[in-house]
Amino acid sequence: MPGRSSSNSGSTGFISFSGVESALSSLKNFQACINSGMDTASSVALDLVESQTEVSSEYSMDKAMVEFATLDRQLNHYVKAVQSTINHVKEERPEKIPDLKLLVEKKFLALQSKNSDADFQNNEKFVQFKQQLKELKKQCGLQADREADGTEGVDEDIIVTQSQTNFTCPITKEEMKKPVKNKVCGHTYEEDAIVRMIESRQKRKKKAYCPQIGCSHTDIRKSDLIQDEALRRAIENHNKKRHRHSE
């Protein structure tokens, strides 16, 4: 447009996106609220399993996690729709101001139309929640999980002995207090030990390999590590039982 500068950041011709981009940034911050809600629901669900509270209460937390995961998907789709619209308009540089709201809504609905339950497998916190819930039930020896895993009637001492192997850090060779799981290979380590190992290797410009014997994963990164809340609780419960038996 004559007399208009298009060199300013966040604008295309006479169309300014600064306000939209600012609002988009604030919208992204809402992601932290969703993550916090998922962490709380996950923690409560694990508490319910640990205390063997009625299944209906646990189901409520599971339902809450589904709702959070759904909200997370909607937020990601909306952010993607806005960003896609902005990029498209910047590239096209139209003389006439388009209906941005309508364009965003069309892109958002197009993304939403492809929704499926399989999408939840891409939500890291939701997947982690389901895995830890299953693991904690197994560690607590709940009947339903024994039947599902085909371990009904198996000696509990054998199960405990097998579980204790998972309690030991492959680096320190000691029982873990703050276990973290590697998302890539699934092995667990003491948090401080594996972080020190990764940092030490990085200082020498080398990759950190998984210290678990037999594991072929040779590039562990801090971003691959997640808190293994189920294992931490299982270790604590095991120690409490051991302490009671020794009294």
Swiss-Prot record:
GO terms for molecular function: SUMO ligase activity; SUMO transferase activity; zinc ion binding. The keyword Metal-binding applies. Coiled coil: none annotated. A zinc finger (SP-RING-type) spans 154-240. It is found in: Nucleus; Chromosome, Telomere; Nucleus, PML body. The modification N-acetylmethionine is found at M1. One of its GO terms (biological process) is positive regulation of mitotic metaphase/anaphase transition. Zn(2+) binds at C185, H187, C210, C215. Its EC number is 2.3.2.-. It holds the Pfam family zf-Nse. Pathway: Protein modification; protein sumoylation. Gene3D superfamilies: Zinc/RING finger domain, C3HC4 (zinc finger) (3.30.40.10). Sumoylated, possibly via autosumoylation. It is an enzyme of class 2 (transferase). There is a cross-link at K90, K107, K125, K130 (Glycyl lysine isopeptide (Lys-Gly) (interchain with G-Cter in SUMO2)). The modification Phosphoserine is found at S116. The keyword Cell cycle applies. GO terms for cellular component: chromosome, telomeric region; nuclear body; nucleoplasm; nucleus; PML body; Smc5-Smc6 complex. Keywords: Acetylation, Cell cycle, Cell division, Chromosome, DNA damage, DNA recombination, DNA repair, Dwarfism, Intellectual disability, Isopeptide bond, Metal-binding, Mitosis, Nucleus, Phosphoprotein, Telomere, Transferase, Ubl conjugation, Ubl conjugation pathway, Zinc, Zinc-finger. PANTHER family: E3 SUMO-PROTEIN LIGASE NSE2. Component of the SMC5-SMC6 complex which consists at least of SMC5, SMC6, NSMCE2, NSMCE1, NSMCE4A or EID3 and NSMCE3. E3 SUMO-protein ligase component of the SMC5-SMC6 complex, a complex involved in DNA double-strand break repair by homologous recombination. Is not be required for the stability of the complex. The complex may promote sister chromatid homologous recombination by recruiting the SMC1-SMC3 cohesin complex to double-strand breaks. Belongs to the NSE2 family. It is linked to Seckel syndrome 10: A form of Seckel syndrome, a rare autosomal recessive disorder characterized by proportionate dwarfism of prenatal onset associated with low birth weight, growth retardation, severe microcephaly with a bird-headed like appearance, and intellectual disability. This is E3 SUMO-protein ligase NSE2. It comes from Homo sapiens.
